[in-house]
């Protein structure tokens, strides 16, 4: 009898431990940045990069993971972009913000090529006249976005480029366009470094946006 109770108790402990492990294990893990926290200085400070990525981005991903484990276990086999495309409400908001931020940070480099080339540059010049005109239009859209949100350069199904401003997490992955570049214009992205000077922040980003990354996205590298 004593042995039977011990076996039952051990089974219960193992089941509890397995349940706890499932509850605490991450569905999606935050990838490491492709550079050190301080390598984007002086354009984005170490403090902002660390807070923005390790706290804000991780927070969105942790919340999305919690919802997935609890409410939609069948979605665990999907990648994060598919979760974004197929979700709504709180799961969408957190998964989209996590994906947006990872995409955003991945386009930066301390050794950035600060102008596009090849077919992407040709398309920009065809539509905006020059790369400088494109940058001016992009910056105007960023500073003109009311409140918090995202600014996107996208490739539309017809091959044309478009600058899209969206509030909150936006819905770029729910569209038929391919995102090439995303800029976070929530205040947490720049307030520690630039206070309310959003335009100055956008202007600084041109120094660290790596157009090699954007060109790969434009060239048809599989959609994220």
Predicted regions and their residues:
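Feature for soluble, non-membrane regions of globular proteins
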Residues: 20-224
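Bacterial Sec-dependent N-terminal signal peptides
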Residues: 1-22
């Amino acid at each position: 009898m004593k042995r039977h109770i011990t076996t039952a108790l051990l089974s219960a402990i193992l089941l509890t431990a397995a349940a706890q492990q499932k509850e605490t294990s991450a569905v999606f893990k935050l990838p490491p940045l492709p550079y050190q926290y301080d390598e984007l200085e002086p354009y984005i400070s170490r403090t902002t990069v660390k807070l923005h990525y390790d706290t804000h981005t991780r927070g969105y991903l942790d919340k999305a993971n919690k919802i997935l484990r609890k409410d939609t276990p069948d979605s665990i086999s999907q990648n994060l972009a598919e979760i974004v495309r197929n979700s709504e409400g709180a799961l969408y908001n957190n998964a989209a913000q996590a994906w947006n931020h990872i995409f955003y940070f991945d386009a930066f480099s301390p050794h950035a090529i600060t102008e596009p080339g090849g077919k992407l540059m040709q398309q920009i010049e065809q539509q905006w006249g020059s790369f400088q005109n494109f940058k001016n239009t992009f910056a105007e859209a960023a500073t003109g976005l009311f409140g918090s949100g995202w600014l996107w350069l996208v490739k539309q199904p017809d091959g044309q480029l478009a600058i899209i401003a969206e509030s909150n997490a936006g819905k770029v992955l729910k569209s038929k366009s391919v995102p090439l570049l995303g800029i976070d214009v929530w205040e947490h992205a720049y307030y520690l470094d630039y206070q309310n000077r959003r335009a100055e922040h956008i202007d600084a980003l041109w120094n660290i946006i790596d157009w090699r990354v954007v060109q790969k996205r434009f060239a048809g590298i599989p959609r994220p």
